[in-house]
C-alpha cells in the first residue's frame, strides 16, 4: 500500500527559486504541520493502521529541545502509544529537522504578507507511508521542500529582522496592506503620481553579496535554479544602481516638491474664486448672502399696479413722499419714519407693495429675507445685519426691505440651550434705533405673524408705522379682477357676480384663479376666456380639481345626492342663510360633493341669527342621511360639516358672548397646570354643555325643515343623480315645481 499526504506550515521564500528537497525517514509515523498542539494519534482505517504525529512546526521553532521532547512524549501518552522506541525515533527525526529551520528563525502567522522583497509561502512536507495492507506500516519518508536555502536568506536581512519570532509588520507589509485597503491619503498620493519609494535595508551590503554571486557565476556553470538566482541578482542590482543615482534622486525630489506647490496653488485659487467679489473683497459673499441692492430702474411695478389695499397704499405713498422731498417735512421739524411694518395674511400683497415703493421712490433699495440671517456659525446673523445697514448708510436716503421679518425679529428667549440665539435681533434693534442714528434709512418689514415679533421691535422709533394689509373687500376684489382680466383675452364677464363669489380670496388667489381659467380655455380650444371658465377655476381653487366622472358605486352616489340635497334644502328655506350658487355630486378633492353659496353683499360683521343659520345649513347633510337611510346608515362624509359647526358654536360661547348660561365673557383655552389661567371644572363643564346644546338645537332645526319638505328633498336628489351639477336657477325651478 502507498499513500501520500501533503501538509504545510508558514515559511519564507525569495523570488521564484526552488531547490532539491531534503528526505527524512520516520519509521511507522506520518509527520505533518498543524495549527494545533503537537500530538500522536491513531488511524482507525480498515485498510491500514498508522500512528500520526501532528506537530505545529511554528511552535517548535520557539521551543527548546527539552520542551520538544516533553511535548512529544505527552502527546504519545494521551493517544495510548506506549512504544518507547517509536517515540524516540520520532523525536530524533524531528530534532534533526529543526536546525535547518532554525537558521531563519522567522515565523509569521499570515501568508502573502510582504517583508521587503521577501514573501511568505508554505513550507511543504510530503509524507509517504510504506507497508502491507492490514498491518502496521514499516516506514515513512518525509520530504521537506523549502523554497530557498537559509544561506541565501541570511545576507538579505539584518540580524534584528532574522531574530523576530512572532508575526510583525514592516514597511513592506504596511505598504502591501495599504495597496489592498487604500486610505484616502493613499488614494490622493496615487492620484498625484508620487515618485517611487526607495527600498529599505542595507542596499550596499546586499549589492556586494549579489556581485560576488555574479562573479562566481562567470567562473562556474550552474543549473536552471542557479541561473534564476543570477537573473534575479542582475535585476536587483540594476534597480539598486538606478535608485542610488544622486542625479535621479535629486530630480525626483525637485519634481515632487514642484508638484506639491502646483497642487496647493490650484486648490487655493479655486477656493478664493468662490468667495471673492468683483471689487476684490474676500468673503463678502459669505457675509451678505442675498442681501443685495436692487436697481430701481429694473423695477416696473408702481402703485397703479397695486389694487385692493387702498389704506396700505396711501401709507406707503407718504413714505415715498418723505424720500422724494425730505426738506418739505424737515422744514416743519418733522422726521422721516424709522420703519414701516406691513402685517397681513399670506397673499395679500405685502411684497408687491414693497416693490411698488422701490419703483416709485427712485432711491437705493436693499432687499433681504429674514431666514438669510440664520446661520450655523455663531455671530454670522448679527454680522450680516451690520453689513446690510453699513451698506445702506453709505447710500442714504434709501429703503431696506426685510421680508418675513418674524424669522429674525422673533421674541427673545432666555433658554440656556441657545445662549447666542438673541444676537441677531439685538443687533437689528441696535441698528434701527441705537446709539448711532441712521438718518435717511427707512426699514420696511413684512410679516404674517405679528404676535411672534419682539415688543422692542414694535415700539415707535423702530417701526413707527404699522400697516394692516387685509384680504380685499368686494370693491377691492373687483379692482383686482379687472386688473388681471386686462392681461388676458376674455368675453363679457360679470365682475359683480365673480367678486361676490370669491369672498375671502386674497390677491394671490384671484390671480391664480384667472390664470387657471386661461389655462382651461386653452385646453378647451377656446379663443377667449368665458365666465364658465372663471367659475370652473374658482371651484377648483375652492374645492380642488374635479374628477373625471362620479363614483361607480351607485349607492354612494345616492347617499351623496341626498346629503348635498339636505344642505341645499335647509339653506333655501332658512331666512338668514347665504343664497345658493351651485350643488354638485361630482367629487372634488377629498369631498364627494359640494354645495356652494354666494353672499348677496359683503359682510363686515356676523349676527347671531346668521351664525345659527350657517350651523343649520351645515347640519342639513347629516340630518338628511338619518331621515332617509336611518341612523345605522349615517356616513363619515359629514365630518367637515360637524367640524365647522363645532367651531362656530365654540366661538359663540367662548369668544363672542352669545350664550346666556356662560354670560358676557371670553374664555381662553386652558394652557395647562402651572400657567395661572387654568379654568375651573365647573366652568369647563358649563362651556361644554352650552356648546353641545347649541349644536343639538341646530340639528333638530335642520331635521324639522327636511321633514317639512320631504318631497322637494327627494326631487332635488333625483335631479342631482341625473344631472350631477345644478346651479341656483335649476334648484329654484325644481323646488317650485315640486311644491305645485
From Swiss-Prot:
> Any idea which UniProt keywords this protein has?
ATP-binding, Hydrolase, Membrane, Metal-binding, Metalloprotease, Mitochondrion, Mitochondrion inner membrane, Nucleotide-binding, Protease, Transmembrane, Transmembrane helix, Zinc
Which terms in the GO cellular component ontology are assigned? Answer: i-AAA complex; m-AAA complex; mitochondrial inner membrane; mitochondrion
**Knockout consequences:** Viable but lifespan is reduced and males are sterile. Mitochondrial proteostasis is disrupted leading to crista disorganization, mitochondrial unfolded protein stress and impaired complex I activity which increases levels of reactive oxygen species (ROS). These defects all likely contribute to the increase in Dronc-mediated apoptosis in neuromuscular tissue.
> In which domain of life is the source organism classified?
Eukaryota
Which cofactors are required for activity?
Zn(2+)
Subcellular localization: Mitochondrion inner membrane
| A Pfam family that the UniProt record links to this protein | AAA
- This protein is called ATP-dependent zinc metalloprotease YME1L
